[in-house]
Swiss-Prot record:
Organism: Arabidopsis thaliana
Post-translational modification (record): Contains two disulfide bonds; only the oxidized protein, with two disulfide bonds, is active in complex formation. The C-terminal disulfide is involved in the interaction with GAPDH and the N-terminal disulfide mediates the binding of PRK with this binary complex.
Region annotated Disordered, chain positions: 1-21
Induction: Insensitive to light/darkness. Slightly repressed by heat. Induced by anaerobic treatment.
Subcellular location: Plastid, Chloroplast
Transit peptide: 1-42
Highest taxon of the lineage: Eukaryota
Entries under InterPro entries matching the protein: CP12-like, CP12_dom
Major localization class: plastid
Name this polypeptide is given: Calvin cycle protein CP12-3, chloroplastic
Tissue expression remark: Mostly expressed, at low levels, in stems and, to a lesser extent, in leaves and roots.
Stretches of the chain forming a coiled coil according to its record: none
Function: Acts as a linker essential in the assembly of a core complex of PRK/GAPDH. Coordinates the reversible inactivation of chloroplast enzymes GAPDH and PRK during darkness in photosynthetic tissues.
Length: 134
């Protein structure tokens, strides 16, 4: 039985080929091939909710850590007086960081593209986004 091997951490699939094995990038989806009849393959799609890019994963982890820190700060500030202005500001900060993390998750699900592409759409004049034609 021939089957494609996949590495889930990078979202890549190696196609079952005798001559060459090329990785195929699939984003957050992992494709697997399974031999049903000799030389005929059926395609199965397995979804996985992991970030495709290391920087995106690190950003989400940092936002999660910030939320935990802000919650601790807010509970400390609100211990003395729950109705104070400082208490409201502290919980507003928690809400803002939580919203930033939620926005990142929504953006990842909707766009599911290279972060450089969205950056270049917003900043086409930067050096990272220049396109050279031969």
């Amino acid at each position: 039985m021939i089957s494609g091997s996949a590495t889930a951490s990078h979202g890549r699939v190696l196609l079952p080929s005798q001559r060459e094995r090329r990785p195929v990038s699939t984003g957050s989806n992992i494709l697997r091939f399974r031999e049903t009849v000799p030389r005929q393959f059926s395609l199965m799609m397995v979804t996985k909710a992991t970030a495709k890019y290391m920087g995106t994963k690190m950003r989400e982890e940092k936002l999660s850590e910030m939320i935990e820190e802000k919650v601790k700060e807010a509970t400390e500030v609100c211990e003395a007086e729950e109705m104070s202005e400082e208490c409201r500001v502290a919980w507003d900060e928690v809400e803002e960081v939580s919203q930033a993390r939620a926005d990142l998750r929504i953006k990842l699900k909707l766009l599911n593209q290279d972060p450089l592409e969205s950056f270049c759409q917003e900043n086409p004049e930067t050096d990272e986004c220049r396109i050279y034609e031969d």
